[in-house]
Amino acid sequence: MGASLNEIKTRIASTKKTSQITRAMQMVSASKLTKSEASSQKFQIYANKVREIVTHLTATQLNDIASDNPRGDINYNSMLISRPVKKTGYIVITADGGLVGGYNSSILKQTMSILEEDHKSPDDYVMIAIGGTGADFFKARGINLAYELRNLSDQPSFDEVRKIVGMATTMYQNEVFDELYVCYNHHINSLTSQFRVEKMLPISDLDPEEATTFDQEYIFEPSKEEILAQLLPQYAESLIYGAIVDAKTAEHAAGMTAMKTATDNAATIIDDLTVSYNRARQGAITQEITEIVAGASALE
């Protein structure tokens, strides 16, 4: 019985130490989440303004494209025009490691479902992985990666992802693939995220009718077409970067939730072990008393 008591005490002490670690990790993830949410909100202000300018610039082209009535005097930007799809590009965003609950598995499972349902052969798509978990997952299944990016910081700057988002945009312009999607978990709140597959190229999220609702008037120098040639790739890059920031926020939320769950589970285990310890201790005391009483009776 004594050995059992010591074993339970050791397990209680070990679980308490683990609980302290998971609680600290929960607090760190909560801090990262707060910073990521603030960064995401700031970026959204910038993204909305860029979108407003791009919508204003592309209103005429978008209306012509929508009505299937192109004009000979306008050089339509290739990033706005859908073309026959021979190959599809995917950017898949995961975490670099674990301790984030089902965050990674959710993204990878649903991405694989898309690949299996929409494509007959790996030759039909191009994969780009952001995050070590996703990169290792695809390599283990023999899926070639056009590019991979690991060890992204907790609050990624545009400079960190400039190469990969610029490369993805250039690959589309060079017709390496004919459409580009980003697969990631969208942050809703600290407890909830939602898997998303968003089409980034060709650019399809602009509504020409919105151009009439803007109060600003713009004077362009040089021409609209020349400005769009520079601005549209930057806009596409900002869309991809926005998805990366959103995914990173969801990752921190998943990490915080996973560590909170681990801490709560540790507390439950400690409570159960404490009850077991008290019962074992009570049993040991009862047995000792019984033995003393029996010994005293034998002496009488």
From Swiss-Prot:
GO CC aspect terms: plasma membrane; proton-transporting ATP synthase complex
Main location: membrane
Subcellular location: Cell membrane
Keywords carried by this UniProt record: ATP synthesis, Cell membrane, CF(1), Hydrogen ion transport, Ion transport, Membrane, Transport
Record's keyword annotation contains Cell membrane: yes
Biological process (GO), any one: proton motive force-driven plasma membrane ATP synthesis
Membrane topology (UniProt): Peripheral membrane protein
SUPFAM superfamilies: ATP synthase (F1-ATPase), gamma subunit (SSF52943)
Gene Ontology molecular functions: ATP binding; proton-transporting ATP synthase activity, rotational mechanism
CDD domains: F1-ATPase_gamma
Family: Belongs to the ATPase gamma chain family.
Quaternary state and interactors: F-type ATPases have 2 components, CF(1) - the catalytic core - and CF(0) - the membrane proton channel. CF(1) has five subunits: alpha(3), beta(3), gamma(1), delta(1), epsilon(1). CF(0) has three main subunits: a, b and c.
Purpose: Produces ATP from ADP in the presence of a proton gradient across the membrane. The gamma chain is believed to be important in regulating ATPase activity and the flow of protons through the CF(0) complex.
Stored PANTHER family: ATP SYNTHASE GAMMA CHAIN, ATP SYNTHASE SUBUNIT GAMMA, MITOCHONDRIAL
Name by which UniProt lists this protein: ATP synthase gamma chain
Organism of origin: Enterococcus hirae (strain ATCC 9790 / DSM 20160 / JCM 8729 / LMG 6399 / NBRC 3181 / NCIMB 6459 / NCDO 1258 / NCTC 12367 / WDCM 00089 / R)
